[in-house]
């Protein structure tokens, strides 16, 4: 059959195709006619960006349909989306994509309607109309996907003056959203609010359901003294994370902030300051941790194991890993040992190339398994 492809310059190209052709095939035909490399092409139909591995019939593209061709700015990149079940999805995006576009891609891959998706990055809920670049989301960033439960509820917020405020919320609302609602009602800026429930200070990027806050629960609102400060946390990879904290924060709160930024569960974190391991129930001021102090983060291995990585030169590297480590994590460990950037690494096991977002256990890689490392030539696929 014939279909049409319209470019941004207004030119229309006619292509001979079959319903069973993949989008990849169509891009190759466009390359033959127009000389545009497939990796610079984005095809749009009915407002949706078409994925390479799908067919025309998957998108119900019929004879004489018109596709729109948009040139991919060189800002094409991959990002990861982590669900609460721990599954990681890889998406091809551009810095100029809106959050709405990203949710549509997640719907294509996972079938979750956009209105049930909430995307979180660096502890912030992302708004549909903003772009990835607005939030400084760069290649290989990880977003967190939280499902929006249907059906609202009421909760109460009690202030130190004894006043009680009633709020309409959803279990999937973040603490940040709740603070914004309090600001709407009471005029108190979110950065001066601290919310306490069951004796715990609530972190902005977490949801009410994360804290098991249910209908008619009561939160306590404490005004934040201007004593906020920044501290640094240095990881074994040499990365330094900056955290906004207060001297009265517990070590548990600090670990929760690290989880929000880096996705590392608190029970796998050990924090060291002045040579001492810090205990969850103590506060920063208990340890005399002051502004711009640096803590050291050591990961606690759970049921760790060793695996081997064999290079083409015949060298074998030993790595300490966990079954739950992603291939991305493994490549980072190889980078730490060998200095090879992750984007130049291809890992092979049992004849299969391993995908970044999957875990070792997904591939049934067990202790003392051997992976093979092949270097990706630059500019190669």
UniProtKB/Swiss-Prot annotation:
Ubiquitin exists either covalently attached to another protein, or free (unanchored). When covalently bound, it is conjugated to target proteins via an isopeptide bond either as a monomer (monoubiquitin), a polymer linked via different Lys residues of the ubiquitin (polyubiquitin chains) or a linear polymer linked via the initiator Met of the ubiquitin (linear polyubiquitin chains). Polyubiquitin chains, when attached to a target protein, have different functions depending on the Lys residue of the ubiquitin that is linked: Lys-48-linked is involved in protein degradation via the proteasome. Gene3D superfamilies: Phosphatidylinositol 3-kinase Catalytic Subunit, Chain A, domain 1. Ubiquitin is generally synthesized as a polyubiquitin precursor. Some ubiquitin genes contain a single copy of ubiquitin fused to a ribosomal protein. SMART domains: UBQ. This is Polyubiquitin. InterPro entries: Ubiquitin-like_dom (IPR000626), Ubiquitin-like_domsf (IPR029071), Ubiquitin_CS (IPR019954), Ubiquitin_dom (IPR019956), Ubiquitin_ubiquitin-like (IPR050158). Keywords: Cytoplasm, Isopeptide bond, Nucleus, Repeat, Ubl conjugation. It comes from Tetrahymena pyriformis. Residues 381 form a propeptide. The gene is TU20.
């Amino acid at each position: 059959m014939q279909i049409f492809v319209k470019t941004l310059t207004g030119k229309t190209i006619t292509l001979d195709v079959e319903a069973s052709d993949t989008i990849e095939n169509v891009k190759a035909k466009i390359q033959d006619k127009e000389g545009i490399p497939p990796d610079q092409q984005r095809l749009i139909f009915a407002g949706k960006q078409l994925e390479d591995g799908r067919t025309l019939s998957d998108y119900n593209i019929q004879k004489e349909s018109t596709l729109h061709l948009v040139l991919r700015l060189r800002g094409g990149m991959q990002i990861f989306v982590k669900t609460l079940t721990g599954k990681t999805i890889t998406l091809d995006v551009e810095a100029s994509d809106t959050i709405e576009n990203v949710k549509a891609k997640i719907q294509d891959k996972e079938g979750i309607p956009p209105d049930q998706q909430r995307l979180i990055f660096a502890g912030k809920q992302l708004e549909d109309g903003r772009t990835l670049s607005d939030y400084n989301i760069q290649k290989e960033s990880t977003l967190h996907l939280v499902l929006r439960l249907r059906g609202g509820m009421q909760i109460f917020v009690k202030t130190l003056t004894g006043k009680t405020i009633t709020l309409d919320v959803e279990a999937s609302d973040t603490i940040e959203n709740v603070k914004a609602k309090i600001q709407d009602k009471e005029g108190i800026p979110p950065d001066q609010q601290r919310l306490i429930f069951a004796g715990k200070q609530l972190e902005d990027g977490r949801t009410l359901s994360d804290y098991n806050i249910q209908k008619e629960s009561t939160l306590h609102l404490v005004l934040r003294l201007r004593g906020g400060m920044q501290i640094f946390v240095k990881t074994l990879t040499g990365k330094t994370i900056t955290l906004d904290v207060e001297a009265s924060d517990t070590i548990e709160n600090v670990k929760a902030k690290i989880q929000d930024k880096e996705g590392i569960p608190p029970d796998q974190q050990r924090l060291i300051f002045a040579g001492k391991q810090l205990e969850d129930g103590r506060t920063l001021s208990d340890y005399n941790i002051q502004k711009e102090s640096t803590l050291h983060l050591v990961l606690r291995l759970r049921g760790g194991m060793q695996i081997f990585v064999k290079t083409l030169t015949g060298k074998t590297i030993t790595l300490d890993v966990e079954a739950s480590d992603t291939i991305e994590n493994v490549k980072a460990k190889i980078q730490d040992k060998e200095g090879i950037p992750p984007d130049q690494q291809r890992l092979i096991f049992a004849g299969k190339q391993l995908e970044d977002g999957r875990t070792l256990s997904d591939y049934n890689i067990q202790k003392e398994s051997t992976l093979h490392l092949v270097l990706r030539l630059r500019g190669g696929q």
